[in-house]
Amino acid sequence: MLSDKLKDKIGNYQDFPTTGILFRDITPILRDQKLFSELIEKMSESDILKKADCLVAIDARGFIFGSSIALNLSKPFILARKPGKLPGELIQSSYKLEYGENSLVFQLDSLKNFKSFGIIDDLLATGGTVNAVANLLNQKNKIITGLSVVVELTELNARSNFNFEVSSEVKY
């Protein structure tokens, strides 16, 4: 089963990046091209992403999966970035992390030609970054078809804060 293979690869680092956090490291998946390819194929099968006009991935590890899935599905792809990383006219939303606070921005013109968006990230923890993206999309009256992540930390129950579907390949 894919989720078991992924769990075998995911690294676990206690007290990283701060004390009390158990960091789930997805980078070993990327070193196994067969497993990475299998994961991209599986995530690409999601109706959440298939029915979206455009895919949006969250800075930075979400870009790895989002760009591959967008190519696989022949979908346009945009970035939700941290401040100071994108030029042009931007819209911004702040969020709290499990271990801090930050903001995300979109280039305003990247949203104008699309009605619906599927969100992609590597990991769902508290849901702060996803809520920031959802807030930005909602500000512009866009439809969110759902969220697709590699890993979901279910004990934090972030999915209960969303009014859209969530798909995760691995649950802890």
UniProtKB/Swiss-Prot annotation:
EC number(s) per entry: 2.4.2.7
GO CC term (a single one): cytoplasm
Enzyme class: transferase
A biological process from GO: AMP salvage
Protein's gene: apt
PANTHER family linked: ADENINE PHOSPHORIBOSYLTRANSFERASE
Source domain of life: Bacteria
Protein name per UniProt: Adenine phosphoribosyltransferase
InterPro entries: Ade_phspho_trans (IPR005764), PRibTrfase_dom (IPR000836), PRTase-like (IPR029057), UPRTase/APRTase (IPR050054)
Catalytic activity, as annotated: AMP + diphosphate = 5-phospho-alpha-D-ribose 1-diphosphate + adenine
SS bond partners: none
GO molecular function (one): adenine binding
Keywords of the record: Cytoplasm, Glycosyltransferase, Purine salvage, Transferase
Pathway(s) per entry: Purine metabolism; AMP biosynthesis via salvage pathway; AMP from adenine: step 1/1
Subcellular location: Cytoplasm
Subunit (UniProt): Homodimer.
Family: Belongs to the purine/pyrimidine phosphoribosyltransferase family.
Function: Catalyzes a salvage reaction resulting in the formation of AMP, that is energically less costly than de novo synthesis.
